[in-house]
C-alpha cells in the first residue's frame, strides 16, 4: 500500500510518500519538509496568518516533488493521509482541503490523522518498536508523557500545565536576544556557559503528580536577566546553560516518575521479548542533545531501551502522518469528506489535566 502524507499543522509544510506492508516494515520513499523559519523569525515566533498563506503558496509544489522523488504517479497512490489536528486552524485547513480534493479527483480513500499520533508511532516506523512503550513528546506545542499501549490506545500520564517545553525555549531565547527558533540557539549558547552560575528552580520536582510546568522557570530566567542587565555574551551563555540544566533536571524527574508508573502496569519481571521495553522521545525538542543524553542515562538506569528517531523525523514531517494513516487504514478506518480540522485534539481525550485546561478544554 502506497500512501501520500500531508502535514501543515504549524510552520512546516511537509509531504511524503511511503510504502507500507501490513504486518511488515514500511519504507519512506520521499520526505519533503519546507520550513517557514525565515518568515517567522522577525516576529520571534509563529504568526498563524503568515503560516497559512505560506502553506497555500507551496503545498501543491511539494506534493508534486514528493511524488517525483518517490518515482510515483498520483494514480499509483492507494490512499492520502493528512494532519487533521491539533494545530493552527488556518494551516490545517490548507492541508485538509488539498487532501479532500485529491481524494475526490482520484477516488482514493483519505484519512485524517492526529498529529500527536504521528509522533507517537514514529518509533514503530523507524525502529520497529513493540508495544507497550513510554513516549515523551516534547515540541513547541506539547510536553507529555504517554503510555502507548497500541495503535489508537494511548494513556496520557502527564502534560504541561502551562508552557510547552519548546515554547519555553523560544520565549527564553527571545528574552536573551537569541534568534528564532529558540531551541537550537539556547543549546548552542549553553555550550559556552557555566550551568552553575544562575540558580534556577526545578518546577514540580519531587511532587508525585506526573505533570510538567515551565512558566515559573521562564519567569526566573527573566528575573535573573533583569538583575544582571545589560547582558554580556558571557552572561547570555551562563543563563542559557543554567536554563538548559534546569530543563534536563526537570525532564529527568518527571520521566522517572512516568517510568515507575509504566513498570507498575507492565512489571519488568514479566516482560517478554528479545528487547527491553522502550523509552521513546519524539517532537522537535527531542533534537536537543542534552535532553537526549539525560534520557539515555535514565533509560539505562531503569532497564529500558532508549529510542530517539532520526532528527529529520523528530520534527514535524509527513512521513509520520502517512505511517499513522496506514495504521488506521489497516484497521479498516477512513475519514469522510465532511470532517473538519480540529485545533485541539488530545491523543487520549479521556485523560484531561486538572489544571491549565482553560475554557476551551485541554490544549492537547
UniProtKB/Swiss-Prot annotation:
Cofactors, names only: Fe(2+)
Superkingdom of this protein's organism: Bacteria
Gene Ontology cellular component terms for the protein in this record: cytoplasm
InterPro entries, alphabetized: ATPase_NBD, Gcp-like_dom, KAE1/TsaD, TsaD
Binding sites annotated in the UniProt record for Fe cation: 115, 119, 316
Catalyzed chemical reaction(s): L-threonylcarbamoyladenylate + adenosine(37) in tRNA = N(6)-L-threonylcarbamoyladenosine(37) in tRNA + AMP + H(+)
Positions that bind substrate: 137-141, 170, 183, 288
Subcellular localization(s) per the UniProt record: Cytoplasm
CDD domains reported for this sequence: ASKHA_NBD_TsaD_bac
A GO biological process held by the record: tRNA threonylcarbamoyladenosine modification
GO molecular function, one term: iron ion binding
Manner of cofactor binding, per the entry note: Binds 1 Fe(2+) ion per subunit.
Keywords annotated in UniProt: Acyltransferase, Cytoplasm, Iron, Metal-binding, Transferase, tRNA processing
Primary location class: cytoplasm
EC id: 2.3.1.234
Ranges where the record places region Disordered: 341-364
HAMAP family for this protein: TsaD
Protein task: Required for the formation of a threonylcarbamoyl group on adenosine at position 37 (t(6)A37) in tRNAs that read codons beginning with adenine. Is involved in the transfer of the threonylcarbamoyl moiety of threonylcarbamoyl-AMP (TC-AMP) to the N6 group of A37, together with TsaE and TsaB. TsaD likely plays a direct catalytic role in this reaction.
UniProt similarity note: Belongs to the KAE1 / TsaD family.
NCBIfam families xrefs: gcp_kae1 (TIGR00329), T6A_TsaD_YgjD (TIGR03723)
Protein name, UniProt field: tRNA N6-adenosine threonylcarbamoyltransferase
Organism this protein belongs to: Bartonella henselae (strain ATCC 49882 / DSM 28221 / CCUG 30454 / Houston 1)
Amino acid at each position: 500500500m502506497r500512501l501520500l502524507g500531508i502535514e501543515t499543522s504549524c510552520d512546516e509544510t511537509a509531504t511524503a510518500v511511503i510504502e507500507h506492508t501490513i504486518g511488515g516494515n514500511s519504507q519512506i520513499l520521499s520526505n519533503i519538509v519546507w520550513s517557514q523559519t525565515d518568515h517567522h523569525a522577525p516576529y520571534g515566533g509563529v504568526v498563524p496568518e503568515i503560516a497559512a498563506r505560506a502553506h497555500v503558496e507551496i503545498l501543491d509544489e511539494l506534493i508534486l516533488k514528493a511524488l517525483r522523488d518517490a518515482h510515483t504517479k498520483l494514480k499509483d497512490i492507494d490512499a492520502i493521509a493528512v494532519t487533521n489536528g491539533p494545530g493552527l486552524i488556518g494551516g490545517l485547513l490548507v492541508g485538509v482541503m488539498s487532501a479532500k480534493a485529491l481524494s475526490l479527483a482520484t477516488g482514493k480513500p483519505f484519512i485524517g490523522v492526529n498529529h500527536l499520533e504521528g509522533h507517537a508511532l514514529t518509533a514503530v516506523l523507524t525502529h520497529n518498536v513493540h508495544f507497550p512503550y513510554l513516549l515523551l513528546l516534547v515540541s513547541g506545542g506539547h510536553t507529555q508523557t504517554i503510555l502507548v499501549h497500541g495503535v489508537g490506545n494511548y494513556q496520557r500520564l502527564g502534560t504541561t500545565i502551562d508552557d510547552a517545553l519548546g515554547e519555553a525555549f523560544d520565549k527564553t531565547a527571545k528574552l536573551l536576544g537569541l534568534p528564532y527558533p529558540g531551541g537550537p540557539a539556547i543549546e548552542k549558547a549553553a555550550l559556552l556557559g557555566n550551568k552553575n552560575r544562575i540558580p534556577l528552580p526545578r518546577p514540580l520536582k519531587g511532587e508525585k503528580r506526573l505533570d510538567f510546568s515551565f512558566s515559573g522557570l521562564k519567569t526566573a530566567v527573566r528575573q535573573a536577566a533583569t538583575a544582571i542587565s545589560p547582558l554580556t555574551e558571557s552572561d547570555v551563555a551562563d543563563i542559557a546553560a543554567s536554563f538548559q540544566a534546569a530543563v534536563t533536571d526537570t525532564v529527568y524527574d518527571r520521566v522517572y516518575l512516568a517510568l515507575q508508573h509504566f513498570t507498575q502496569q507492565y512489571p519488568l519481571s514479566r516482560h517478554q521479548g528479545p528487547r527491553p521495553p522502550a523509552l521513546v522521545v519524539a517532537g522537535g525538542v527531542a533534537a536537543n542533545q542534552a535532553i537526549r543524553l539525560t534520557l539515555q542515562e535514565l533509560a539505562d538506569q531503569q532497564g529500558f531501551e532508549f529510542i530517539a528517531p532520526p532528527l529529520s523525523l523528530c520534527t514535524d514531517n509527513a512521513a509520520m502522518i502517512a505511517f499513522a494513516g496506514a495504521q488506521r487504514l489497516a484497521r479498516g478506518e477512513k475519514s469522510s469528506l465532511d470532517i473538519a480540522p480540529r485545533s485541539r485534539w488530545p491523543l487520549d481525550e479521556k485523560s484531561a489535566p486538572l489544571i491549565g485546561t482553560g475554557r476551551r478544554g485541554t490544549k492537547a
